[in-house]
Amino acid sequence: MVDGSIHVPVQSHEGQHDNSSSLNEEIQTSQDPLGIVESYQESSTSDFDKSHYTHNSSIAAADSEYGSAFIQGQSSNGSEIKSERPSIDKKLDVNIDSHPIEPPPFEHDIGLPASQVPAAEEEVESTPKAKPLYFLLDKRFWIVFFLGQVLSLCITATNTFNGYMSGISNIPAFQTFLVYALLTLVYTPYTVFRMGFKKYFEMIFRHGWKYIIFAFFDVEGNYFVVLAYQYTNMLSASLLDSWATVAVVILSFIFLKVRYHWSQILGVVACIGGLVLLVVSDVISRGDYSAVNPGLGDGYMIIGATCYGVSNTLEEYFASKLPLYVVIGQLSLYGSIISIIQTFIFDRHHLYTLHWTSEMGGYLAGFILVMFLLYSLAPILFRMSSATFYNISLLTSDFWSLVIGIHVFGYHVYWLYPIAFVLIILGLFVYHVFVDATRESIKPWLKKGQGVDGVGTVRRPPSLVSSNDELNKKNDIVVAHHDNEVKERIYDAYLSVKNVFVRKS
């Protein structure tokens, strides 16, 4: 129970009339040690709803942030007993030492379901207003912006390592497996350490199905995108890859009930427009974009981009509710299982005939380390901003690839490239021009008592439970998954799509 909770011993029904005076004394003595209630009792009587006293339950209410609490009861003569501990706004001379403040919660402290939250507090405004260009003075925006470019550089680095390895080997599923395996070795033991074996396996049995779905879309997104480049040309692949951004916007709108400002949609369109200019520049400058089977390759790219969209949306949802080590650990655990199965199905012949060299080992090690960094940092960006901003930030990776290509592969810069890069960067700024940078951090789908306080999150006053209770430390992560909520969101998304295509009779 958080600090400020009030426990009132309740007498049995038979002894209510005989002990009403002792009950009054106990309430006033335990909850009003400074004698404040008497001066406020009469004035506060009309401010509260009248309710009957329940004899078979204790009365408890807490408001840890504002410091107010209320008790209602009924004495033997039918009059109501009311007690109020005044809030900080009363500016009374109260001994603060008698009400110690709990330390801030840590990454593992998870909010309880809304039904278990003891007291209601003021909601955080779900759509903060922002003056035009005010975001330029917001430190949080610049952190999100530069973090997005770091992740974009990670994508560029992985593409570079893939480019080197493509001439030596063709083992995309095995490469992905090694990335998931490293993530599992790092994050899963730490998750077990924080939760304990019993609660960890309880989470696996009760909530593993969610992470299997999450990991499946992530693995298949990686697989189909790599596969698409073997059949279609770079022009089609680059354009269709931007479908991941559109998919995230649609899925966030339907599944997470996110509502976008018109300036955010304009920013997304500007970023995609910049990507189109990049592709056109490639066509003009390099020209030869023959494809083995463009129809099949385009289909693979659409499937892969859609899987990326689903994966990013789910990761933003999970990262807002759970510690990062749980989200990454579960994704990598099930991802490694799925990817090793695909490796034996699709890559086993290549592995048997592969000639390992130190050069290939270096490229593979670089690919794995960069992907490890990408998977570790991406959930932080999901918390601080959104999956949509993450995807439009990655669109600059084509420009960074050109910069590397100039120095490594001897590429020549076409004049449309700088314009395209500026247009993408402009789109990132337009995305936040009329919207507070903290708006997406609030996560409107989080209810009271939900959410996690950790790296990149915005503190939500009613969202956390005390970290001092050892029982909560072990149970919070299991409780915070909210099985029914996920199923309800999936069903609501189904109804939303159905209502679009099916007319009501």
Swiss-Prot record:
List of residues that carry Phosphoserine: 463, 466-467
Region of interest (Disordered), ranges: 1-52
Bilayer topology term: Multi-pass membrane protein
TM annotation in the entry: 141-161, 173-193, 208-228, 235-255, 265-285, 290-310, 326-346, 362-382, 389-409, 415-435
GO cellular component entries: Golgi apparatus; Golgi membrane
Biased composition (Polar residues): 18-32
Chief subcellular location: Golgi
Localization (cell): Golgi apparatus membrane
Keywords per UniProt: Golgi apparatus, Membrane, Phosphoprotein, Transmembrane, Transmembrane helix, Transport
An annotated Gene Ontology molecular function: transmembrane transporter activity
Database matches in PANTHER family: DUF914-RELATED (PTHR14233), SOLUTE CARRIER FAMILY 35 MEMBER F2 (PTHR14233:SF4)
Protein family: Belongs to the SLC35F solute transporter family.
Protein name as it appears in the record: Uncharacterized solute carrier family 35 member C320.08
Lineage of source species: Eukaryota, Fungi, Dikarya, Ascomycota, Taphrinomycotina
